[in-house]
């Protein structure tokens, strides 16, 4: 739980204390990582791994359904898009550097999951996924239909060969 708070605070002690106070106010004295993600509006890591699996396996439909689930839960699509961008960045770092808990500020178990998931995807595809998600994050702020931007990014990530054909 503390690692999640520290990551969300991005090194700011006051921000970390504020997040911790919010979590205690909403959840009481026993606060789990899932509770913290809920307070912050983000998704827990298992949901991100599942959505990334769908994208890596070429299942755009499942990834779009994941986005629909985020919306139904009242979560912020922008936060979800940013979380997915961070997740694919972690996969790219895992692919390039191997064990890199220090760079990613993650536990050894999470690092092992990143390495396993990254092993099923090429470096170029991971870079393209990070780029597509970062474009979606930046573009979503200015669109009246931000959902379409993120769905389009998911479809491009899930079907890289079809996206390349369309660009040709």
Residue ranges and their predicted role:
Residues 1-167:
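Extended, largely alpha-helical regulatory/partner-binding modules appended to the mid-to-C-terminal parts
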């Amino acid at each position: 739980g503390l690692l999640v708070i520290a990551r969300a605070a991005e090194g700011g002690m006051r921000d970390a204390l504020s997040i911790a106070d919010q979590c205690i106010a909403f959840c009481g004295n026993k606060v789990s990582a899932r509770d913290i993600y809920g307070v912050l509006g983000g998704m827990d890591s298992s949901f991100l791994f599942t959505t990334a699996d769908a994208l890596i396996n070429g299942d755009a439909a499942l990834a779009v359904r994941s986005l629909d689930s985020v919306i139904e839960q009242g979560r912020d699509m922008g936060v979800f898009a940013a979380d997915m961008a961070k997740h694919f960045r972690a996969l790219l770092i895992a692919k390039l550097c191997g064990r890199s808990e220090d760079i990613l500020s993650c536990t050894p178990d999470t690092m092992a999951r990143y390495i396993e998931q990254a092993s099923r995807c090429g470096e170029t595809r991971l870079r393209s996924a990070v780029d597509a998600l970062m474009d979606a994050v930046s573009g979503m702020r200015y669109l009246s239909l931000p959902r379409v931007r993120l769905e389009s990014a998911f479809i491009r990530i899930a079907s890289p060969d079809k996206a390349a054909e369309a660009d040709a």
